[in-house]
Design a protein with these regions (language model features):
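Single conserved hydrophobic/aromatic residue that forms the stacking wall/gate
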Residues: 1-7, 11
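Glycine-rich, N-terminal phosphate-binding loop and its surrounding beta-alpha-beta segment
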Residues: 12-73, 78
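Active-site-proximal helix-loop elements at catalytic-domain edges
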Residues: 27-41, 177-188, 248, 256-263
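Ferredoxin-type iron-sulfur electron-transfer modules in oxidoreductases and energy-metabolism complexes
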Residues: 188-210, 228-322
């Protein structure tokens, strides 16, 4: 949707002050907000004499559709699933995932900042509840899951049967574009390895991190970042417990009384990218915690992003091989 007030493209509840734009490739913020909101009221705690009640607030109980996600963002949701649906299950996230249906659009014109193919993602053929393609003004629709079938049944009066000739041609055209993008052939060699201490202790980090402003922009636009903080507010009528996004790039992230949080920006910078490219895939069957959406490439004020990190270590590896 085009938010007139914020003058940016975003995915949010449809309202009268918003215009639908199916041509936009990427929203400014990722659609993870639909399942992991930037801020949500989890509980209200109330005291009545000696009795205390705790009332959950954020449990989603209505079905909804997220329309227009791209393949990279769908993969981002899968990354979040591993975090929030593992043991112990996050019931607030679980409720949204159970009630939400994702309709993903193929990327008609991938942008230069996109590099999803590096992580095995096919922008031409998204894996969601429903995969869709817009071709010559027509919407081609393919349900892939039970949720997708249920949604298709609900809108069947708007649909007609079609062969896949145009869709297959569109897929090929998209893949041909992707092959020509500048970051498509980045190498992930050396990442997601059990023996990672050489990379952890590499002097490359000291050179890379210095332009970092610790603004946190990369973490807030990222579809896979899942760090959050918990805040309690006493309204006088009860204590509200909120969950809100946080950033591992902030100096007070995970601040505790005994002061064991990371003490330097270099350490925080290194942790962010080691988590994306090493720790997460080692603990999740090789799935990387980057999906190549390119938002950090576009939004970092210092042009310091995961592509630069990967390239820096590619160069270091080449120098060693020489």
């Amino acid at each position: 949707l085009c938010d007139r007030r914020q003058r940016q493209m975003c995915i949010r509840d449809r309202s009268e002050d918003a215009e639908v734009s199916l041509e936009t490739l990427k929203t400014v913020k990722s659609p993870k907000d639909a399942f992991f909101p930037q801020s949500e009221n989890l509980y209200i705690c109330k005291k009545d004499g000696k009795n205390i009640s705790i009332e959950p607030q954020a449990l989603k109980d209505q079905n909804f559709v997220v329309f227009g996600m791209r393949a990279c963002d769908v993969q981002g949701v899968k990354v979040l699933d591993n975090v929030f649906l593992g043991d112990p299950v996050d019931t607030f996230y679980q409720a949204r995932r159970e009630h939400g249906t994702i309709v993903a659009l193929a990327c008609h014109e991938p942008e230069e900042s996109c590099f999803c193919k590096v992580f095995g993602i096919d922008a031409a053929d998204p894996e969601a509840d429903v995969a869709a393609w817009i071709i010559e003004g027509e919407l081609f629709w393919k349900p892939l899951t039970e949720k997708g079938n249920a949604l298709t049944e609900a809108v069947k009066e708007l649909l007609a049967d079609s062969d896949e000739t145009k869709v297959e041609a569109e897929k090929k055209a998209i893949r041909d574009i992707i092959e020509l993008l500048p970051y498509t052939h980045l190498s992930l060699e050396g990442w997601a390895q059990e023996e990672y201490m050489d990379r952890f202790n590499s002097p490359v980090w000291e050179k890379l991190y210095k332009p970092c402003l610790a603004c946190g922009t990369c973490t807030f636009v990222c579809p896979t970042c899942q760090c959050y903080d918990i805040k309690d507010y006493d309204t006088g009528h009860g204590v509200h417990r909120y969950r809100c996004w946080d950033s591992c790039m902030y100096s007070d992230f995970t601040m505790m009384a005994h002061g064991n949080n990371r003490t330097s920006q270099m350490q925080r910078f290194r942790q962010r990218f080691m988590h994306k490219l090493v720790y997460y895939p080692l603990n999740n069957d090789g799935m990387f915690s980057c999906v190549g959406c390119g938002r950090c490439v576009e939004k970092c004020p210092e042009s310091l992003n995961i592509v630069k990190v990967i390239k820096a270590f590619e160069k270091q590896g080449g120098e060693k091989n020489e």
